[in-house]
């Protein structure tokens, strides 16, 4: 929005041309979303408290979590609104990728909002039934996949890129739709499963979002893409503004979500942020890199799959409780230790993901 204004004002003062630079608008995206989150966070927390929109805590979980009962939830709305405003202000609104990622984020956020609303407001412990949750995730995920497939302008946009193998890639054809569906829906649910401790999900999301933002910038620049032997995706660079907004909004939310949390993001935030990461990774053709950088999300998801499969097949549980962060809590780890160690793991994995830029 402001980019259009800057383009108009250039005829009066050439200095406004500085807003054409992606790096500047990415930084402004971070700062705008951060300021919005910090400024409106206290108001949102008070509003949620006044309306008694608080978290319910399971009795069979770690006993330390009982003190969290009643903590305001659905704070993910603060993240999404900050991301949305910042992106609309600083991104090029004629870029189709910006709209795809923004719409996917908001639509998955809507699914999470309905789920949270039923749990917290209607006091329905089941929330949105799983079949309906997955149905709408599938509808929106497939919709995004089909759109990206139909609007692909080059073959590389539907090709699976294998990091560290510069001369080998897999043309997917229509299989791109299937892969994209699983990446978007899978990452959405993976972040949601991780969101079980104060700050556990949001900081890895910020880190992975920052890593993907670097890939967006490089993939959208033909010279950098050719030099680094990564796919050149025209227009993908504009997503650095969205990634910047995600980082700013996430850090602003973490200010209130850090242990002991004043607010939880709820499904409205977790489902949306996971879907955003998946969609960005698909656009820049870095699904495997997302798998690496988001290793904490993958680990949390696998722990649930293993736990359920083991119990159904043998009647025994592999972990004391799943997702795996609860397993460590029940082993006696203090919550902050679990959180920070998972953050450290994410830092390492993001660096490994970025290292694939040169290991080709």
UniProtKB/Swiss-Prot annotation:
Keyword set includes Transcription: no
EC number: 2.7.8.13
Cofactor(s) demanded: Mg(2+)
Keywords: Cell cycle, Cell division, Cell inner membrane, Cell membrane, Cell shape, Cell wall biogenesis/degradation, Magnesium, Membrane, Metal-binding, Peptidoglycan synthesis, Transferase, Transmembrane, Transmembrane helix
Gene Ontology BP term (one): cell division
Transmembrane segments: 16-36, 73-93, 97-117, 134-154, 168-188, 199-219, 236-256, 263-283, 288-308, 338-358
Main location per the UniProt record: membrane
Database matches in PROSITE patterns: MRAY_1, MRAY_2
GO cellular component terms, A-Z: plasma membrane
Localization of this protein: Cell inner membrane
Residue pairs linked by disulfide bridges in the UniProt entry: none
Reactions this protein catalyses: UDP-N-acetyl-alpha-D-muramoyl-L-alanyl-gamma-D-glutamyl-meso-2,6-diaminopimeloyl-D-alanyl-D-alanine + di-trans,octa-cis-undecaprenyl phosphate = di-trans,octa-cis-undecaprenyl diphospho-N-acetyl-alpha-D-muramoyl-L-alanyl-D-glutamyl-meso-2,6-diaminopimeloyl-D-alanyl-D-alanine + UMP
A single MF term (Gene Ontology): metal ion binding
Family per similarity comment: Belongs to the glycosyltransferase 4 family. MraY subfamily.
Protein's job: Catalyzes the initial step of the lipid cycle reactions in the biosynthesis of the cell wall peptidoglycan: transfers peptidoglycan precursor phospho-MurNAc-pentapeptide from UDP-MurNAc-pentapeptide onto the lipid carrier undecaprenyl phosphate, yielding undecaprenyl-pyrophosphoryl-MurNAc-pentapeptide, known as lipid I.
Protein name in UniProt: Phospho-N-acetylmuramoyl-pentapeptide-transferase
